[in-house]
């Protein structure tokens, strides 16, 4: 390099020369030269800066030329580097006097480069003076500080983002006790914040769960825009504006970098490359180039990736995915977390898990390595196994995986092994979720084997750095998870090992490459679908789970495992955990399937007819006594409401069916006996039935045959006029009953089948013929039934839907199966009732007549209560048939004719109830005929009373 006048007559570095030289004629010649220089490179020269004692978590160039570089890390120190001096003469950095109590995560220069802000895990932001290295102020937070940004127009204003989910705006001129302005307050952590360089009222944030957002200071607590479209709820860890403030670059966990226009929620481009992965650590990104035409990001595969932003917005194709990096910078020996670009010198700085800061430049620097074509490959290293990491921690004598007490700038094997273990676990977790049929060891090898890394080969420091423990002869191939093909030439022991795992045949390499291609195709397909479809929300949520900043595991976790334990045992334990998880998931699926297949209840009838009462009536117990003292002492006619469309429990149904069946048999036999005995003699069947009832008389009561014939004639005439559907209603409303209250108790406890009280529901009939409803109404005293019916009519209508008379319901013939006890009871009753008309019941509503026999025996069918009467499949059946039976015997009533044979006027409420419930004209005519017949026979009844 020639000496130049005006430069002090001293030799200057390339960086200083490029920044200080003056070109006459075209002021843009320098930018054009540097742009062309970078565009023609396939690799960059690299050089390491040594000074930190631990991981370097934050780096920032100074403004207006990038003359200074500030760095901070796990050693809790803030170092200030003069770039020209550090590159040329290896001058030690300046340590600022303000020291944190824990890891440093973020740094920022003010616009004049006179102050430096640093924040970290100790929940505070320290303001440093660059010239004096003194601490100017401390700003306390409630949690760890992850991001810092200084206002581009006011050096007194800065923003901080912290783990407590708050973005705070601070003014350094305020008193230390003043409260900052809270711009955002979320339950999840903010990892990054940045002022817009052109519009300082706008800020961009990266949240661990809410993704990337744009904020306005004038509108706190509510973001202006949430980027990402339908996939906005993603775990974002870094966000950067370009120099014009028109675009945003963001990093997301387990997803490639994404570029947004600040006015659009949808991404402009996504950038991916084979081998790029971002999952294990918190990283940052930046723009590069004098026109921000490149982007930069570190990766978990120890490489630094540079993509070129296409000039055409449609260049990315489907999903706008830029697949293929412009440049892959290889040289780091562990994960790359931080990267910054200096637009004035085209210099790139990167750092991460290592203690070094690596400088990348298109110009050859003193003591640099590498070339611009990528033909020179450096040595790479093997990954430490988890057992080796535990062994290193235990043998070090310290319980920590990193120790800064010795203040060494050399590579720490424990720290490298710790993050190697993180990478292994992350890849193993990915392989367990993948549907690939390859083994885990193959997936581990292919993930790292394709990403060939250059070694850490600084001429001065590499000789003193300890090498990773070489794999022994007895190690399996799973332990030999290495980073690309290794050229091990420095250690004789390693070179003399015959069975080195670094050698692989062509078939295994081809297998690894093909598997990785399939994996990359799936990733690209998923990325394409994310931008154009809304069907990948679940997959995005799976990828956006919060990953905390890595902490070193406790040494007790692996204390029971000696350093000589093989990876097969580790795989065995992993397989056992997975098998347990699969068994637990399978058991849960079986339980869920069993719950889904479990029947929810008895089958319901799906056929619905007009007039069907579908109201869910309350269930009333069968044994409830009637509250009315004037009605039958046994039960009231309206004591049971059964929902038509819902079957009661089997036990209750069978009990009610048996009662109804017995009562019907007895009623049918007694009625047929009256109709067949026209000679005035009481039927033998009726006598046997009456003799079996407790509390009844055994004396015969002669009845004139003429009155029976008149009764049958009137019944036949009424049968012709009475509709089959409405016959039960008016017959029940007109028929009244009263019994001897003294005989109720004895009759209730009768042991005979026909003496049991009928509590209405259903009867099974023969499907070969139609069902005809039989209702017998024999009047003794019209007061009891009339009151029961009137109380029924006064109840409000239960269902808003229309009701047909009798509340019809279609019931299949098999709804009420007959049990063996029912068949035996039927056979026993058939011996008593020989004449049963082939099992068909004929509707013969009997009007109140004046014979003595009818005055003592009353069997009333209350037709207005819901129940079941099964018919043919095509004919609806009358529901809700209640059988209300009087307790008095015919002989007892004949012995006391004056007490039991008084006639009361019909209760008008009973007549009104029939009009309310049944509105058919045929029923009204039937009621009038019954009233006429009643008036004609009143004279004969009066004679009996006297």
Swiss-Prot record:
GO cellular component: Cul4-RING E3 ubiquitin ligase complex; mitochondrion
Biased composition (Polar residues): 454-465, 760-769, 808-819
PROSITE patterns per UniProt: WD_REPEATS_2, WD_REPEATS_REGION
Bias (Basic residues) ranges: 579-592
GO annotation (BP), single: protein ubiquitination
InterPro entries recorded: DCAF8, WD40/YVTN_repeat-like_dom_sf, WD40_repeat_dom_sf, WD40_rpt
Biased composition (Acidic residues): 531-544
Biased composition (Low complexity): 555-567, 625-638
WD repeat windows: 51-91, 99-139, 140-180, 185-225, 277-317, 331-370
Compositional bias per record (Basic and acidic residues), positions renumbered to this chain: 691-701
Listed pathway(s): Protein modification; protein ubiquitination
Phosphothreonine PTM sites in chain numbering: 500
PANTHER family with a match to the protein in the record: DDB1- AND CUL4-ASSOCIATED FACTOR 5 (PTHR15574:SF43), WD REPEAT DOMAIN-CONTAINING FAMILY (PTHR15574)
Role noted for this protein: Is a substrate receptor for the CUL4-DDB1 E3 ubiquitin-protein ligase complex (CRL4), involved in the ubiquitination of a set of methylated non-histone proteins, including SOX2. The complex CRL4-DCAF5 is also involved in the ubiquitination of methylated DNMT1 and E2F1.
Subunit structure: Interacts with DDB1, CUL4A or CUL4B. Interacts with L3MBTL3. Interacts with SOX2. Interacts with DNMT1. Interacts with E2F1.
Protein known as: DDB1- and CUL4-associated factor 5
UniProt lineage: Eukaryota, Metazoa, Chordata, Craniata, Vertebrata
Protein's gene: Dcaf5
